[in-house]
């Protein structure tokens, strides 16, 4: 109820979407979908592929946002992106833009990449530039996240545990 009321109140501001209006509860998402007058974006907090399938098949979102670590990495991202493509739902990525920009751009329904630079500057060989509000993907092979020699030395550890 609260999310639906907020969506109605926000509708006068011409916002792009309401993001994650509820946690990963399919029945709550269905209820909000029925009464929301705003587009919905969700997915960044979803882990299970079956939940993504249900959301896409039932058209419970206008934009599917994938969080690379939560959706089983690159393989999971690609599998779920194909589910969204099959259901004609635009694909967006959540965080880790350094890697997810190339993944999102690889799909015809790739729509938007969340740009939130949480890492120290100069950590990657690739530079990511923004032009006219658009984040441009690197123009070289790879996933777009090659660590610099300085970063490798600075953040090196002797063991994983």
Predicted regions and their residues:
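Catalytic core of soluble alpha/beta enzymes
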Residues: 1-94
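Flexible C-terminal active-site loop/helix
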Residues: 5, 92-161
């Amino acid at each position: 109820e609260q999310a639906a009321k907020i969506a109605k109140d926000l509708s006068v501001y011409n916002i792009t979407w309401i993001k994650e209006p509820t946690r990963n509860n399919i029945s709550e998402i269905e209820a909000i979908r029925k009464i929301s007058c705003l587009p919905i974006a969700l997915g960044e907090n979803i882990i299970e592929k079956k939940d993504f399938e249900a959301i896409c098949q039932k058209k419970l979102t206008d934009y599917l946002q994938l969080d690379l670590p939560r959706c089983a990495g690159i393989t999971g991202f690609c599998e779920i992106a194909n589910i969204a493509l099959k259901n004609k739902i635009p694909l967006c990525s959540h965080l880790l833009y350094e890697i997810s920009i190339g993944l999102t751009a690889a799909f015809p329904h790739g729509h938007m990449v969340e740009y939130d630079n949480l890492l120290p500057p100069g950590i990657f060989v690739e530079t990511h530039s923004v032009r006219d509000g658009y984040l441009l993907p690197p123009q070289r092979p790879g996933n777009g996240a090659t660590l610099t020699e300085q970063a490798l030395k600075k953040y090196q550890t002797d063991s994983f545990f």
